[in-house]
Amino acid sequence: MNAALLYALAAAGANVLGGLVITTHSRGGRTTQRLLIAFGAGFMLAVALLAMLPHTLREGGANAAVTVLVGYLLVHLTQHVLTPHFHFGEETHHVGHWTGVSALLGLLLHTFFDGVAIASGFRVGSTLGFLVFIAILLHKIPEGVTVASVMLASGNTRRMALGGTAALGVATVLGVLVTDQLGALQRHGLALSAGVTLYVAASNLMPEVQQERSRSSAIMVFVGAACFLLAWWMLGGEA
């Protein structure tokens, strides 16, 4: 079993863990969720801008930049068409049944590209692969919390909510497996996933931080970015 697949399995487990937080009534960790989202926003933004994008543009030039934009807009389109109600964190009020289904469908594409990002990172090198994995892992638990709570709020059972988080994990693993087999994803996967990662950091996570208006959340964004820089330096500083 290759390293990318092992890391994808770990990321999938974090999705399920996020679902367990909700389905087992362990709801006392909202502050922890908030800080984790802020830390993940800073780390993911740094990974996308300082590691994934430079390598993508160095290898593919202007054409790669277009592919990055396609990845960004693809997630934007799916979230605004399928999941207009989507936001990271726990859903606390009742929503319609379609909202739960659409949230799961939209996130399945997103988590598939999490797997593509992990596989593409490891195809470049172990340093980039590991840093991309950490960035993805940091938002996997809030992601599991999100889909489980939205499904519960839309009238689904706890078993179905937990099954939804497991489906997200399966999509991540599939992203790795498909990338390993599909030549087009091997060539363009890093550029696409750079766009997806940039969208998740800048358009999903950062608005959650800004909405909180919390000093600790704002600081954690900087801590997340600083931790990326430290890890990048310790691992050799070469994407």
Residues covered by each model-derived region:
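Intrinsically disordered, metal-sensing/regulatory segments
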Residues: 1-239
